[in-house]
């Protein structure tokens, strides 16, 4: 698969355009925002999840994507997650002065999700707790439950972060996915937040 992309970053903002034979994606973020978003991926439920991610992380986010959704939404969903991971990594820069770690437990009615984020520079995902069959549910007419894990895999790999995501409770497939996105948002918000008491990079190694 051929890819062409360009990234420009200033302060704690970043922008990337990524084009392949399967999709065209633009993502722009501001880590020091207020949760304002402009999302259009042609996958309505995914738009809803990304809007929630922006709102609850306080990361301003613009996402524009088109792709071969007439075949399957998988390519577009994953490529947006890849691009978001890349711009997140870029916007973080050398990670000096951030809190680095974040944790959140978020409910949505009967669903409850717990997320822990480490902006470590080492990509790793631990994802579990979803009820049997969650991956097969079609949510909003296009988004299959299995895509949730794919999104978090792509973000962690390309952002260089560690994420532990565990679904503690849940019955409704929509609620289970949304609780995870909101828990991730709150944990990410805490992890990337500047800590006025931290001087330099929050690692004994001196680099993240």
Curated annotation (Swiss-Prot):
Its main location: cytoplasm. One of its GO terms (molecular function) is imidazoleglycerol-phosphate dehydratase activity. It catalyses: D-erythro-1-(imidazol-4-yl)glycerol 3-phosphate = 3-(imidazol-4-yl)-2-oxopropyl phosphate + H2O. InterPro entries: IGPD_sf (IPR038494), ImidazoleglycerolP_deHydtase (IPR000807), ImidazoleglycerP_deHydtase_CS (IPR020565), Ribosomal_Su5_D2-typ_SF (IPR020568). Its EC number is 4.2.1.19. It holds the Pfam family IGPD. Pathway: Amino-acid biosynthesis; L-histidine biosynthesis; L-histidine from 5-phospho-alpha-D-ribose 1-diphosphate: step 6/9. Disulfide bonds: none annotated. GO terms for cellular component: cytoplasm. It is found in: Cytoplasm. Gene3D superfamilies: Imidazole glycerol phosphate dehydratase, domain 1 (3.30.230.40). It is an enzyme of class 4 (lyase). CDD domains: IGPD (cd07914). Keywords: Amino-acid biosynthesis, Cytoplasm, Histidine biosynthesis, Lyase. GO terms for biological process: L-histidine biosynthetic process. Belongs to the imidazoleglycerol-phosphate dehydratase family. This is Imidazoleglycerol-phosphate dehydratase.
């Amino acid at each position: 698969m051929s890819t062409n992309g360009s990234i420009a970053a200033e302060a704690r903002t970043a922008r990337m355009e990524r084009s392949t034979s399967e999709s065209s994606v633009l993502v722009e973020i501001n880590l020091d925002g207020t949760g304002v978003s402009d999302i259009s991926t042609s996958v309505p439920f995914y738009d809803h999840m990304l809007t929630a991610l922006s709102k609850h992380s306080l990361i301003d986010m613009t996402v524009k994507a088109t792709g071969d959704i007439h075949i399957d939404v998988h390519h577009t969903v994953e490529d947006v997650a890849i691009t978001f991971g890349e711009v997140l990594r870029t916007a973080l820069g050398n990670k000096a002065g951030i809190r680095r770690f974040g944790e959140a437990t978020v409910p949505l009615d009967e669903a409850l999700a717990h997320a822990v984020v480490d902006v470590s520079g080492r990509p790793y995902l631990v994802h579990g707790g979803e009820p049997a069959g969650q991956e097969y549910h079609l949510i909003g007419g296009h988004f299959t439950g299995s895509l949730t894990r794919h999104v978090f895999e792509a973000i962690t790999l390309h952002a260089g972060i560690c994420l532990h995501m565990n679904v503690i409770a849940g019955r409704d497939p929509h609620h289970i996915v949304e609780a995870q996105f909101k828990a991730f948002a709150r944990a990410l918000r805490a992890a990337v937040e500047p800590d006025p008491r931290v001087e330099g990079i929050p690692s004994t190694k001196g680099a993240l």
